[in-house]
Amino acid sequence: EATTFSYQMGIGLETSFTGEDSLSATIDIGEAAGVGTGTTTGLNFDSNANVLTLDGLSYTFPLGGATVVVGDQTDISSVYTGACAYSAFTDYMGNCGTGNTVGVEGQGVTAAMSYAFDSGFSLAGGISSEPAQILTNTGTDIYGIEAAYTADSYGVSVAYADNEASTAWGINGFYAFDFATISAGVESVDTGTTAEGFFVGLSFPEVGAGSLDIGMGTTANFADGAAETYMYEASYSYPLNDGMTITPGVFITEGAGPGGADVT
């Protein structure tokens, strides 16, 4: 038995040339637990070398009534509206379980565009390619498109993604009650075999001095008949001051291990 400490810090830098555009950079530094001494399973630790790393560089600007973003290490979904009101503690629960579609990432160099209509409806889409093989036959490109509708108390988002090796559909949404908001998502990925996953969570915006989130879902998309693994989490976020918020949380995974026995 061993105890380890892991950390990650992100620095976001942003400037504007016209007041309507923005040039953004994200710098990460961190140290994650090594193999055999612990695990960061479920937590989004991108850096483990204890050195500063440029995690993303993007330029966002208006084009007519649309918004365009181009960048390196930039997610296609950075222009998506989404409809997930849940504040995830673990990476698995991010985007309400639709990380391959509504939360589709980038392959490297990314160009994406979104347009928001006055009615609450929005459309977005983009493409991302490997930096050295942009739109070539040998490179891997990711295409994504999203349609969303949001109102004061509810919203829904549907997205499709294609990375040449697989296609995926995802949908997430939320509904706000007076005391809490429920969010849910489902996703289906086809690589020749269809795999599916789901998420559901509750967000309580006013619990004491902070807010409480409780959720559960699959840790990935699983094919029919495959042994599924589930994750349960709870987190409480509260502000220490105007510039700092602390979010302690707990999570547990549960599924079938060797021989079909349950493993937690």
Task: List each model region and its residues.
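Beta-barrel outer-membrane channel/assembly domains of diderm bacteria
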Residues: E1-D75, T90-E130, G139-T140, I145-D152, ...
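Short, well-ordered, mixed-charge alpha-helical segments that flank or form enzyme active sites
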Residues: I76-Y80, A132-I134
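Long, hydrophobic, well-ordered secondary-structure blocks that form the structural core
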Residues: Y80-Y92
